[in-house]
Amino acid sequence: MTHFETRPLCSLNSPLLCGFFPIKLAVLLVQLIAIVIQFCMLYYNGNQEEIVFVAMVLLLVFTISSFVAFLGEYGTMMAIHYYVSCILLIWPAVVFIMKLISLCNKLFIEENATSRDAKDFMKITAILFAVIFYIWMCLQLIRVAKSRLILPRFTIRSN
């Protein structure tokens, strides 16, 4: 008996970062690290206020569902993760702008800037660029997933 199954063409292929490192692996690795960090935060900071605890649990559920979405290449869930990440990018961008204004104020007006101020600014700059780079990698995976063809796979079952 024969039947057709649909499957994504080249579902295991991923765009490459620097020509040799799969973007999908990098995204999954970042998400896995985020899941571990969030579990640790819940474990060690479990006695927080109820609203903070609920927010941390919801963020953990979102991160786990995003991991499953990128692992299984579920386009809709990947897109939801992308858009939520773009919205959450507002937070590091606001902190970056605040640190930039503070550093400029200390450099040019108060003239008492320290190396700690510069280090804080560099940290938030690195975090902001890392988040932007992560979102860009997610977008690349979404574009590849949308451009894949769904081809039938012919299988033969023998009784």
From Swiss-Prot:
Pfam families membership: DUF5373
Name this protein carries in UniProt: Uncharacterized protein C48B4.7
Organism: Caenorhabditis elegans
